[in-house]
Amino acid sequence: MPACRSRPRCGHAGALTMQRYVLVDASARPDTPQALRYYLQDLPHRSLFARQPEAEHADLGPWLVQLPEFGQAPIEGWLRALEQGHPAVAWLASAGDFDAVFDHLETCLDLRRPNGTLALLRYWDGRVFVRLQRILTANQRLQLLGPIARWRTRVLGEDVVVSLSATDGQEHCDA
């Protein structure tokens, strides 16, 4: 597991206003990048590959999107349909602002291999995220979450939720 550059947690999840985010794998279907461009016009968004060596593939990488605090954005119906057939959407809640969440997720992209080379860790893919929950230590899972209080993804028709308890500061996983 990469040592994601740890950021301080934003306090207890229940004490602060949670912002809603989604992490979308734009490579899920051939039409996903075009659909994202259509739906993202009025929402804060950025590809996690934008400042990476993979920048030339930013349109096909994972995108962080901030959803409105209240109400539903048109993109949400499309995302729910996308996640029915592809493990391509992660619904996140964080007290952190867009830049804090983006910066944290960006720092978790690289995995240092034993030989010193870097590999891309596809944690935004729901299938990979579920496997990571099984193999990472509790501390590593908390590092991956960073400022994220709740992470929900759908794999094989089942919701997987990892959340930080506001009362005990501990991480919980419901699959």
Residue ranges of each PLM-predicted region?
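Terminal low-complexity "docking" segments
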Residues: P2-R122, G126-A175
